A protein has these predicted regions:
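Domain-length accessory/inserted modules outside core catalytic folds
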Residues: 1-127
C-alpha cells in the first residue's frame, strides 16, 4: 500500500506498507486510531491511539477549515487512501501523494502560551 509517512521533526516521505493491521501497528508503534481531517480528500491519517498518553513527541497540528488548530498528533503517523464507499484502506493516488507531501512538508514545533497551543513550522537551513 502506497502511503505518506510523517515522523516528528522530519519531512514526510512516500513509502510502501503491507496492508495488514500488524504492519500498521508497527508503523505507529502501538494500537491505531483513524483520524479524518476536514476536507481529507479521500484519505485517512493513521496514528498511535495512545500517543499523547505515552508522551510521544508532538508531530503535526491538525487544522479546521479556518486554519485553527483543533488537535496535535503525537508520535509517527501515516496517510493512506480511504475511499468513502469502502471499509478498507488503499494506496494513495499520485494527486493525494502530492497534496499530503505539501500539507505536512515542514516539521512543527509546539509551545503552550496562556492555554493556547502555538505551532511554529521548522525551516530547514538554507530555506
Amino acid at each position: 500500500m502506497r502511503i505518506i509517512m510523517v515522523e516528528p521533526e522530519r519531512r514526510p516521505y512516500e513509502t510502501e506498507l503491507e496492508d495488514s493491521l500488524g504492519a500498521m501497528q508497527r508503523c505507529v508503534g502501538g494500537t491505531i486510531e483513524v483520524v479524518y481531517e476536514p476536507g481529507g480528500r479521500g484519505a485517512a491519517l493513521i496514528c498511535n491511539d495512545e500517543g499523547k498518553l505515552l508522551n510521544l513527541p508532538l508531530n503535526r497540528a491538525l487544522r479546521d477549515e479556518k486554519g485553527e488548530i483543533y488537535d496535535v498528533i503525537a508520535g509517527p503517523f501515516f496517510i493512506c487512501g480511504a475511499p468513502p464507499d469502502s471499509e478498507n484502506f488503499t494506496s494513495l493516488t499520485d494527486e493525494q501523494v502530492d497534496y499530503w507531501l505539501r500539507r505536512f512538508a515542514k516539521p512543527e514545533f509546539f509551545v503552550r502560551v496562556n492555554d493556547k497551543v502555538i505551532c511554529v513550522p521548522v525551516e530547514e537551513p538554507g530555506q
